[in-house]
Amino acid sequence: MIQKNTLLEVADNSGARAVLCIGLLGGRKSASIGDTVIVSTKSITPRGKVEKGKVYRAVVVRVKSPIRKSDGSVIRFSSNAVVLINDQGEPLGTRVFGPVKKLSSGSFMKIMSLAVEVL
């Protein structure tokens, strides 16, 4: 589960490497896959689309905590990862790295189509 002050990896090519969760949308205490969080960039790559210290929205695509599927199997990722999005819900990057759990919300279909592997 993702909560405030959680350090997250960025799973796209927007230019950010690591971000810090500074808020959760919807008044929750923790976020899971498919939830939108408010993040601040902590480390960036040169010539990226984002700036260090700026605030962005992001969608959680991977969490370390185990997730039980309806068939009884369990999925566990090795890292907590997000994809940065703009105010309209579209991803800032053009590629998504690593596996992505199927996002239940229909508003993030673009992220699932950019992903290499959808579980």
Swiss-Prot record:
Ranges in a coiled coil: none
Gene3D superfamilies xref list: Ribosomal protein L14
Biological process, per Gene Ontology: translation
Gene Ontology cellular component terms for the protein in this record: cytosolic large ribosomal subunit
GO MF: large ribosomal subunit rRNA binding; structural constituent of ribosome
SUPFAM superfamilies linked to this entry: Ribosomal protein L14
The entry's keywords: Ribonucleoprotein, Ribosomal protein, RNA-binding, rRNA-binding
Stretch forming the signal peptide: none
Cited CDD domains: Ribosomal_uL14
Function: Binds to 23S rRNA. Forms part of two intersubunit bridges in the 70S ribosome.
Quaternary context: Part of the 50S ribosomal subunit. Forms a cluster with proteins L3 and L19. In the 70S ribosome, L14 and L19 interact and together make contacts with the 16S rRNA in bridges B5 and B8.
Membership in a protein family: Belongs to the universal ribosomal protein uL14 family.
HAMAP family assigned to the protein according to its UniProt record, in alphabetical order: Ribosomal_uL14
Full protein name: Large ribosomal subunit protein uL14
Species in which this protein is naturally found: Wolbachia sp. subsp. Drosophila simulans (strain wRi)
Lineage: Bacteria, Pseudomonadati, Pseudomonadota, Alphaproteobacteria, Rickettsiales
Gene encoding the protein: rplN
